[in-house]
Design a protein with these regions (language model features):
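Conserved phosphotransfer cores of two-component systems
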Residues: 51-53, 76-82, 103
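Conserved phosphotransfer microenvironments
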Residues: 59-76
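A Lys-centered signature of the CheY-like receiver
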Residues: 111
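Alpha4 helix (beta4-alpha4-beta5 surface) of REC/receiver domains from two-component response regulators
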Residues: 71, 92-108
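Non-catalytic signal-transmission and effector/linker regions of two-component phosphorelay proteins
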Residues: 1-29, 38, 56, 78, ...
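Acidic, metal-coordinating helix/loop segments flanking the phosphotransfer/catalytic sites
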Residues: 39-57
Length: 143
């Protein structure tokens, strides 16, 4: 079922915590669009947050110090099999891509993350899943 985000009160994206500037970089994409950024440190925290709030997508770091990204997605899939997940990784080999495909990961993005590519993938995801161009390019002003 496709739902239109214009009917929703809030849009929530849940991401892996990081010891680098990752959350702040995401805020630069999300804040102008009115998207709430929620951060989880572990697989159990991901599930706990998903149980409490409507989450529209997750962005999971394969290289998280707290938990393996694929293991986190596997745990999410137990209770939330349709929740879209994007996986970030510094080592996107065939084995990892095969496992991500088995877990129905929406997209695998290489690290360091190109924020333009991430925004494009979020736009594809939100168009497909929610019929929303929330992450599309801002309209250009013509003179």
């Amino acid at each position: 079922m496709v739902s239109n985000l214009s009917q929703l009160e809030e849009v929530n994206v849940l991401v892996s915590d990081a010891n680098w500037a990752w959350p702040e970089a995401l805020r630069r994409i999300f804040r102008p669009r009115g998207v709430n950024l929620l951060v989880a440190e572990s697989a159990s925290e991901f599930v706990h947050i998903i149980e409490k709030k409507r989450i529209h997508t997750t962005i999971v770091d394969m290289d998280s110090e707290q938990s393996n990204g694929l293991a986190t997605i596997r745990i999410i899939r137990i209770e939330y099999p349709l929740l879209p997940c994007i996986l970030l990784t510094s080592t996107a080999g065939k084995s990892l891509l095969g496992k991500a495909l088995q877990l129905d990961v929406f997209s695998v993005i290489d690290k360091p993350v190109d924020m333009h590519i991430l925004r494009e993938q979020l736009n594809r995801l939100f168009l497909k899943k929610y019929n929303s161009s929330l992450f599309g390019d801002p309209p250009r002003i013509r003179n």
